[in-house]
Regions:
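Ribosome large-subunit tunnel/peptidyl-transferase-proximal elements
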Residues: 1-108, 118, 136, 141-151
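Hydrophobic, well-ordered secondary-structure segments
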Residues: 106-107, 111, 124
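C-terminal structural segments of small proteins and small subunits
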Residues: 120-130, 136
Length: 151
């Protein structure tokens, strides 16, 4: 008796098909852009998604300087860090961080949406953020996609 068997496909480093994707951040809201980029990096839009494998795409983000924050977040949102010394807690507002380096806003938002382990660190290395419209990954021929088409 022959039965139909649907086996679960588990990806590994040999069977993963990684692509280069170009995302334009011009006019995009920070959180919505970051969550979709984190899903792209993680590989959740692919049918062979496997949680413990780096099966996502390499993502290049351009125009990070044109990102949008809603409400009063430019003034009220704070990024806190600690120097490691007693009384060494420091904080920056979103505006101050943006003036120092516009790419850090997107990088911190996406990194916070990835797993907090070795896989998350490896996935974060698949993200390339540029403040302007030019990028250094032209040799990889990234495919431009519209994030509004993704769920």
């Amino acid at each position: 008796m022959n039965t139909l068997s649907y086996k679960t496909v588990s990806a590994n480093s040999a069977t993963v098909n990684k692509e280069w994707v170009l995302v334009d951040a011009d006019g995009q809201t920070l959180g919505r852009l970051s969550s979709k980029v984190a899903k792209l990096i993680r590989g959740k839009y692919k049918p062979n998604y496997t949680p413990h494998v780096d099966c996502g795409d390499n993502v290049v983000i351009i125009n990070a300087e044109k990102i949008v924050l809603t409400g009063n977040k430019w003034r009220d949102k704070s990024y806190i860090r600690h120097t490691g010394y007693p009384g060494g807690q420091r904080s920056l507002t979103a505006t101050e961080m943006f003036e120092k380096d516009p790419t850090r806003l997107i990088e911190k938002a996406v990194k916070g949406m990835l797993p907090k382990n070795i896989l998350g660190a490896a996935l974060f290395r698949n993200l390339y953020v540029y403040a302007g419209g030019e990028h250094k990954q032209a040799g990889q021929k990234p495919k431009a996609i519209n994030l509004n088409d993704l769920k």
